[in-house]
């Protein structure tokens, strides 16, 4: 009986070494730009992957024959648009290498806009959504607070330098609303971001940009509506998502967090680099 148990364990270990590798990533706690600078920040950021590690891990995994697929949980804490764009590009390149990609989320923007989360999801082959979730496509708007009136009421004085009309960072302190150039710059930014989201939705659904823009403007959508409109591919819970991913990967498939994969590959490369010849 003991021998049989040991034999089973050894067989499972062999399968883990030779079976397909499924990388997983959880982005619901956000993503970190740089390593934490102090102990408290490090503790608070323990569940937040570093952007550089994610990008480098995906780059390594593209060329790794052992890696079969990638499954990512999206939603929760918001990620900045610039980071989302980098992640979208990296996942698109990973997918184009021939490996399967699956995104899933409990919701994409429940009670808040989910444009960035859904834009990231469009980089994947398949999108799963929890049956109680939403796809928060709401169109894009940008806003800015101005403090000139409050500072005047408080009697606070300040000195601000400003060189050009489009350098408008100081406008929050010096103006009570948008200047012409500042409004123009912000409108161009909003138009560019909306164009990227529209193009991503149009490409994924294989529809004209005008139809994609209509879908964005008419949101948000509950899960059943999103499925009917093909904004998501399936409704289900985590266990159903992973069952499909494992079945698609084949016998012996096993999971590994992308962060651990990145660290192990980096360590292996350093060992080869410094190994005496």
Region roles according to the model:
Residues 146, 221, 240:
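Residue-level recognition of oxygen-bearing side chains
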Residues 239-247:
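A ligand-binding cleft/hinge motif common to bilobed small-molecule-binding domains
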């Amino acid at each position: 009986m003991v021998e049989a148990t040991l034999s089973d364990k050894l067989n499972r270990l062999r399968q883990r070494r030779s079976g397909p590798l499924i990388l997983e990533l959880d982005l619901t706690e956000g993503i970190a730009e740089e390593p934490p600078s102090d102990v408290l920040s490090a503790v608070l950021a323990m569940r937040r992957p570093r952007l550089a590690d994610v990008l480098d891990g995906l780059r390594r995994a593209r060329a790794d024959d052992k890696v079969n697929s990638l499954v990512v949980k999206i939603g929760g804490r918001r990620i900045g648009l610039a980071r989302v764009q980098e992640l979208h590009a990296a996942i698109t390149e990973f997918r184009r290498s021939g490996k399967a990609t699956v995104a899933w989320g409990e919701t994409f923007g429940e009670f808040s806009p989910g444009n960035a989360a859904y834009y990231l999801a469009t980089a994947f082959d398949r999108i799963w959504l929890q049956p109680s979730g939403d796809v928060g496509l709401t169109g894009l708007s940008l806003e800015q607070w101005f403090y000139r009136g409050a500072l005047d009421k408080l009697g606070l004085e300040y000195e601000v330098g400003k060189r050009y009309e489009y350098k408008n960072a100081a406008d929050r302190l010096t103006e009570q609303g948008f200047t012409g150039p500042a409004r123009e710059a912000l409108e161009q930014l909003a138009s560019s971001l909306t164009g990227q989201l529209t193009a991503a939705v149009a490409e994924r659904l294989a529809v004209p940009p005008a139809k994609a823009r209509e879908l964005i403007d008419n949101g948000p959508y509950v899960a059943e509506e999103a499925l009917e409109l093909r904004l998501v591919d399936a409704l289900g819970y985590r266990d159903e998502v992973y069952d499909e991913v494992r079945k698609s990967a084949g016998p012996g498939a096993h999971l590994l967090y992308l962060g651990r994969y990145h660290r192990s590959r980096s360590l292996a490369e350093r060992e080869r680099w410094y190994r005496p010849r």
